[in-house]
């Protein structure tokens, strides 16, 4: 086989024409558009970290998703590979595709076994083609079982633009980036089938997140992207803007997928209202503390019932800093609960909730461990792909040397065998790189759920804060009643009554009334948050099982499918070089 005329036909003219291409071997990794150079194989442009790999590979197409992406044929000669997709397509348009050609396509095992599980109904509804499990997870992280399967909402973030802040100063305002947010939906709350776009800056997203956190206490609200001030200074501007665009799109899609948040007025205003965002901006901590310090003297001296917690504010946590006296009272109540000898008037007695809370904590630790192992796996696969690429390039250089020095057919035969081995190694490297990109996308589910664990902890913190408010108000009422009784007893001893004490008694009674109303509102808020926690934990448990099952299916399909592809590549090389084993045995 190796001594055949075809083997001898490893034309030196073609090889000489490609000598310069060997150093920069054009083996398009992503479909032929990006050549694989020695620097790529050595890992100069690769990402070693799992998190950085996620951002750079987020747009790579899922190999499980039909239809397959046409790429450079894996069975083609790497020395003669076309430099672009158009060259490849034109070179194959004039001849039939044989069954022996091995494309970088969805693994055959995956097509046969698991092809139904990776269907993206959302993309079919919206007329778009986005079949990656990563996008599916982002869109379905919080699915509503009660919503109709025909309902959809698709949000895209695109077209970042730099704009100038309006300023009256001579220097001028700062520049900032705005993003075009386009929404396509048929939800009745958004006016039925419609499409609309607005431009928003990152500060608007922060305002939206703050408003949702205040309004929907007890819900597991997906965390917003971080400000990333350091990264904005270190990273390239274009890369940073693109990374933020992707993060904002994922965040808004998660919000729109939440069964409650998707119908919120805040999200509707954010997505629909043109111009400046009409939602009130969040007040910074320093301003809130300053407001609290201004009110503190009146609260301490009890002027006009100022020490009472307003009913309008009892629904929000005291840690915001606007009411320092309430903050001090709840801090004292918290210390009393932990270190005091007396039992608080209301305690957390929901054993089922306490068990779920402990399980969530354990789950978070398990996800952290699994995420670390996933990062190690990605790094190992990346190293294997780079090593295979280096091996292939080394054999290509050796092939070049053998052909330059060849004076007889056996030398050319050996050179041809080395070329086949180099081809197999480079194809295996390409398979490893593609496998790694899909592994990142599938196992990215672990990182997504780490973010959701933060949201769960925030929902539980809302419950604890609401309970602490109830405990503080219940403890304060007996104290106020005792003060009134003492003042009434002292006033009764004075003939005609003590006017100052009578006025103080009236103020305390007004404070008691306000505190009683605040207590009732706080109890209702606490019960509402408890119900929100219960429904959210049930929803997350249900969705986690489905998401983790999809993650494992996709991971296994890719591992088996690409192992099958690489096995076929090496089996072909073993068959082509089997004559050496026969010669060794015969000798």
From Swiss-Prot:
Pfam families: PX (PF00787), Vps5 (PF09325). Residues 331-586 form the BAR domain. CDD domains: BAR_SNX (cd07596), PX_SNX_like (cd06865). This is Sorting nexin 2A. Homodimer. Heterodimer with SNX1 or SNX2A. Component of the retromer complex which consists of VPS29 (MAG1), VPS26 (VPS26A or VPS26B), VPS35 (VPS35A or VPS35B or VPS35C), VPS5/17 (SNX1 or SNX2A or SNX2B). Keywords: Cytoplasm, Endosome, Golgi apparatus, Lipid-binding, Membrane, Phosphoprotein, Protein transport, Transport. Disruption phenotype: Reduced rosette size and inflorescence length as well as root gravitropism defects in snx2a and snx2b double mutant. Accumulation of storage protein globulin 12S in dry seeds. Residues 135-150 have a biased composition (Low complexity). It is a peripheral membrane protein. GO terms for cellular component: cytosol; Golgi apparatus; multivesicular body membrane; plastid; retromer complex. Residues 42-59, 123-134 have a biased composition (Polar residues). PANTHER family: SORTING NEXIN 2A, SORTING NEXIN-RELATED.
